[in-house]
Amino acid sequence: MKFFAVLALCIVGAIASPLTADEASLVQSSWKAVSHNEVEILAAVFAAYPDIQNKFSQFAGKDLASIKDTGAFATHATRIVSFLSEVIALSGNTSNAAAVNSLVSKLGDDHKARGVSAAQFGEFRTALVAYLQANVSWGDNVAAAWNKALDNTFAIVVPRL
């Protein structure tokens, strides 16, 4: 998986302060509301942070409008969202903590090999949260659940970069 498996950042981490069942439910339900918009999610990230787009050789240096409707873009966006969906589905159940940790650890290892920085993970987080805020019912409780999930994920990913 390429850089945008980074969407795993929107997921529940299985460390220090795992999500409660209620927090996981908020993350899962808000993700379910947008997870069918794979192309739009990836396009929003690329539009906000072109440096992330340039990490992908097949998309680097190209106008976003010219690639957004291509099969390659849709395929890649679907891979990312599917990965995210898998990890999000595992959230909120302590018996799944090892699986989440394994998936997110591999994400960090894979992205270290590609030269992805902690700052770029931060950019991705910012773009993803902005997309969610604009496209789901977003209150303080949803924001807190996503922030906790992302903080937990960063605690696993960043040391591996």
Curated annotation (Swiss-Prot):
Record's GO cellular component terms: extracellular region; hemoglobin complex
Range of residues in the leader sequence: 1-16
Sample GO molecular function, one term: oxygen binding
Binding site for heme b: H76, H111
Xref: CDD domains: Mb-like
Domain Globin: 18-161
Keywords: Heme, Iron, Metal-binding, Oxygen transport, Signal, Transport
Record InterPro entries: Erythrocruorin (IPR002336), Globin (IPR000971), Globin-like_sf (IPR009050), Globin/Proto (IPR012292), Mb-like_M (IPR044399)
Pfam families in the cross-refs: Globin
Note: There are at least 12 different components in Midge globin. There are at least nine genes for VIIB variants.
Homology family: Belongs to the globin family.
Subunit note: Homodimer.
PANTHER family: GLOBIN-LIKE PROTEIN (PTHR47217:SF1)
Protein name: Globin CTT-VIIB-5/CTT-VIIB-9
Species whose genome carries this gene: Chironomus thummi thummi (Midge)
Gene: CTT-7B5
